Amino acid sequence: MKYQQLENLESGWKWKYLVKKHREGELITCYIEASAAKEAVDLLLTLENEPVHVNSWIEKHINPALLNRMKQTIRARRKRHFNAEHQHTRKKSIDLEFMVWQRLAGLAQRRGKTLSETVVQLIEDAEHKEKYANQMSTLKNDLQAMLGKKE
């Protein structure tokens, strides 16, 4: 396991995830009978500040179809949580117009790189081009100055 699991923190995430899914109308319990499902959900709603009990609620009452999706969501959230601790792993987002994204994605695919690697490569290419243009301009000015002095 790459990222440390923090039981209390993750139990809070699980509680929020389950409550959100319930409010969106998804069945979060394994019960078909409405009264049993409502009873289990009511119990869950009382467990917001009791992380140990949230995990036991999950073991007893969760809808099996929801369990894997919840695990994936928590795993992704754990990764984002730990990556956010360090500047170099913290993710940022930018808004692109669809056509720009499409061209960038195509270029990245042709180069066999990620979108981030492609953006870095394009920036480096532009910086090298700018540096080369400045060197040529300086060289041209130096040559003109040398030729102008000899006459």
From Swiss-Prot:
One of its GO terms (cellular component) is cytoplasm. Its main location: cytoplasm. One of its GO terms (biological process) is cell division. GO terms for molecular function: sequence-specific DNA binding. Keywords: Cell cycle, Cell division, Cytoplasm, DNA-binding. It comes from the Bacteria. Transmembrane segments: none annotated. It holds the Pfam family MatP. Signal peptide: none annotated. It is found in: Cytoplasm. Required for spatial organization of the terminus region of the chromosome (Ter macrodomain) during the cell cycle. Prevents early segregation of duplicated Ter macrodomains during cell division. Binds specifically to matS, which is a 13 bp signature motif repeated within the Ter macrodomain. Belongs to the MatP family. NCBIfam families: PRK05097.1. Homodimer. This is Macrodomain Ter protein. It comes from Enterobacter sp. (strain 638). The gene is matP.
